[in-house]
A protein has these predicted regions:
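Accessory alpha-helical DNA-binding modules that contact the DNA backbone or grooves
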Residues: 1-141, 162-163, 183-197, 210-212, ...
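Active-site catalytic microenvironments in core metabolic enzymes, especially phosphate/sugar-handling
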Residues: 335-338
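Charged catalytic cores and adjacent phosphate/nucleic-acid-binding surfaces used
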Residues: 101-263, 273-293, 298, 302-331, ...
Length: 464
């Protein structure tokens, strides 16, 4: 039924409920529990029924899972392609958290500039992949797509499109700060444009529209602010002084420092699926100058120290041979992603560490340690001289698992003093280090690495 079935015992229970009460849906289960039917079954009782009701209640309170950014981008791209087929569409853009490139996205919002909103709306609601039309108005409409994904459309006059685009891109906090700046200038901002408010101000009360966001920000004495920066994290103050940071683009990226090949060192976690040679060819295609192969460490439970060392020597030889045959091409660093054990140790002997150019360490177990204990654990692993990178540092999995608790100022101070690097993991299900902590790391002057955590050659395309 989708609520709380996570063990073999849960599966047996669900099977009995289906068989004996004919339950086929979440609604059926709730009705059966509320009416007392479950407690009357042999082996259940009142306590079991109450437990099921509590699980259902907890499930109902849980917020719906948000869409991972790459999936939301794909859905939006398909809708935008469809909209562009209509001759009345002058311009089309995503809105909200999708346009700001947030790690997860709720409903997918899209805006269109057009002089014929009726024609655009009619075309939008005829989207062939829609499950149903949720709402259809004169300038707005909503569709439900398979997977219960909602797509909302707004159509604006091209003369005022820039104002609408700016307003509905957000974020909320960015817009509040922008509104405060405008008020100090005697202006009022909205999704329709900017209105003079101060007594005696030229054109008082007459709204000024903007075709583009660039014109909108310029009117407020500001440089254009890219959507990715609109979080009220200093961009409002930096923009008028021409001090906005330059965004990193794909063409700027010269390396991927977390890749898992299928070179078998009998790893503790999942092995990659593509050969080193295949990965090197893809890296060359992407224009990279260097990459790192970072297979998981050999399983400590299945190998003694000598076996681990021998496996790592074997990999060292393979990397050296590939570098020799790859002269004047992509350089390969021999690395490893090593588990940080609960007490802070690492399961690779020093003789094995000596085979590496550098190592990554990461958390794959015991996620709920108290903050002080977890911080001590991480710093202990980072103290090894061969360890340079803390990989997917919060250990979060979007929509699945919250991140670990760490004393980040203490972590960052350690990094600063010991010249360690911290990873931005580009796997769509992680996007870790989160953006807020990236900005903090930069303030400390800490070096950041980028890694796709690819376990297949196609995963190298996840660099974001």
């Amino acid at each position: 039924c989708g609520a709380g079935i996570s063990t073999a015992e849960d599966v047996k229970t669900a099977f009995r409920l289906v068989k004996e009460l004919g339950i086929e849906s979440y609604t059926d289960l709730r009705k059966a529990a509320a009416s007392g039917k479950i407690s009357k079954l042999e082996g259940f009782g009142v306590d079991s029924e109450a437990s099921i009701l509590k699980s259902l209640s907890d499930f109902e309170k849980k917020p719906p899972a948000r869409n991972l950014l790459p999936y939301a981008m794909e859905v939006a791209a398909n809708i935008i392609t469809w909209l562009k087929k209509n001759k009345d569409v002058v311009k089309v853009d995503p809105l909200g958290s999708l346009r700001r490139q947030a790690s997860t996205v709720g409903d997918i919002d899209i805006s269109v500039a057009s002089n014929n909103p009726e024609g655009v709306i009619k075309h939008f609601v005829s989207y062939p992949n829609a499950s149903r039309v949720l709402e259809k108005g004169q300038r707005t409409a909503s569709l439900i797509l398979p997977g219960n994904i909602q797509v909302d459309l707004m159509v604006a006059d091209p003369k005022g499109y820039g104002s609408l685009l700016q307003h509905f891109t957000g974020s909320k906090h960015h817009n509040i700060a922008l509104r405060e700046r405008a008020l100090k200038m005697g202006l009022s901002v909205s999704d329709y444009g900017i209105t003079p408010r101060r007594q005696g101000f030229a054109g008082q009360g007459k709204i000024k529209q903007f075709k583009t966001e660039e014109e909108f920000y310029r009117y407020l004495g500001m440089d254009y602010i890219p959507p990715e920066l609109r979080e009220d994290s200093g961009e409002i103050e930096a923009s008028p002084n021409h001090k906005l940071p330059k965004l990193v683009e794909l063409k700027d990226i010269k390396a991927d420092l977390q890749i898992h090949s299928n070179f078998d060192i009998e790893t503790s976690h999942d092995l990659g699926q593509s050969s080193m040679k295949e990965v090197c060819e893809k890296a060359k295609e992407l224009g990279y100058e260097y990459i790192a192969f970072t297979e998981h460490n050999p399983s400590k439970s299945k190998h003694g120290e000598k076996q681990i060392i021998d496996l790592l020597k074997k990999k060292r030889q393979a990397v050296d041979q590939l570098n020799y045959s790859n002269k004047n091409s992509v350089h390969i660093f021999n690395s490893l992603e090593i588990d940080i054990l609960p007490e802070g140790g690492i399961p690779v002997p020093d003789a094995g560490m000596d085979t590496l150019d550098f190592a990554l360490v990461s958390i794959h177990s015991s996620f709920r340690l108290p903050r002080a204990e977890m911080t001590k654990r991480v710093l202990s692993a980072l103290s090894h001289p061969k360890v340079k990178v803390f990989a997917h540092p919060t250990a979060r999995k979007l929509n699945e698992r919250e991140g670990i608790e760490l004393n980040w100022p203490e972590i960052f101070e350690f990094y600063k003093k010991n010249n360690k690097w911290i990873e931005i993991n580009c796997d769509p299900g992680r996007l870790d280090l989160p953006d807020v902590l990236v900005k903090e790391a930069i303030k400390y002057g800490i070096k950041l690495t980028l890694g796709t955590d690819a376990h297949h050659v196609d995963g190298l395309n996840n660099m974001m």
